[in-house]
Amino acid sequence: MTDTTPRYGFPISSVFFQICVTIFITLLLFLTIISNFIVGSFLIIVSLFCFWYFLILNFKKKFFSLREKILHQMISQAHLTGIERVLDLGTGAGYIAIQFSKLLDSGTVIGVDKYDQHTPVLGSNFFEELKINFFGNTLEQARQNARIENQQDKIIFVKSDLKRHFPFSNESYNVILSSQFLYCIPQKKIEKVLTEIDRVLKPSGKLIFFESKKFLNWDIAKIQLFFNRLGYHTQIHPLNNMPNKCIFIAKKP
């Protein structure tokens, strides 16, 4: 049966939370079976299950609402005319790329990611590759989503590990997007990636990044400093209800 609804996935924390709660309820059920308090324990299990279900339902509802607000803020900063070439870094299942493609006429969106359907999970970063492949944030899913949204003619998905190779020409994009992609780049490689981003962005082009403000060794202020030194006009926009997230905007001279 052909899917008619795009699948853009959920935060990994949401999925792991559901798994943990499911394991907990299963364990509680096992303890119930081997105990003599079947009726009372059964009621506890039912109550916990209902609590878990509505908690997850509420979480997903809030997640969808926040994701849409973030998208609208990114779009409002792009000031698209419809003819732009747009590059989406770490596109995942293609949510940002596909929504931007809907606003283009003769323009094109390129979504790039290192994960496709056939990416092996037994690599150098097992847990990272496992979570991406297992939860479906792959280029294969992105292509399917584009077909479902009828955007396949305005968007191209490219496989590339951007930490190693940026397969794009100099000054070839008007807008470059990312959504929580840069903070995943190892610190020793981040400057190389940022230099490549600058290389492929056209003069007067824009960078629009949704990122954490600070996370472990990550600090958005360092990204701002890098582009300030290149003469970019930069801004960091805070997000309501997401105190540690922001949208980073930079315009190339």
Stretch-by-stretch model annotation:
Residues P6-F17, C50-A78:
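Class I SAM-dependent methyltransferase Rossmann-like catalytic core
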Residues I83-G92:
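Conserved class I S-adenosyl-L-methionine
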Residues A93-D105:
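Conserved SAM-binding loop of SAM-dependent methyltransferases across substrates and taxa
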Residues L104, I185-P186, L201-P203:
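Helix-to-beta-strand junctions that scaffold the AdoMet/dcAdoMet cofactor pocket
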Residues E128-R164:
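S-adenosyl-L-methionine
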Residues K163-I176:
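A short acidic, Gly/Pro-enriched loop at the edge of an enzyme's catalytic core
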Residues E191-P203:
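A short glycine-rich, Lys/Arg-flanked "PGG" loop and its adjoining helix->strand segment in the class I
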Residues S204-E211:
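Conserved beta-strand signature within the Rossmann-like core of class I S-adenosyl-L-methionine
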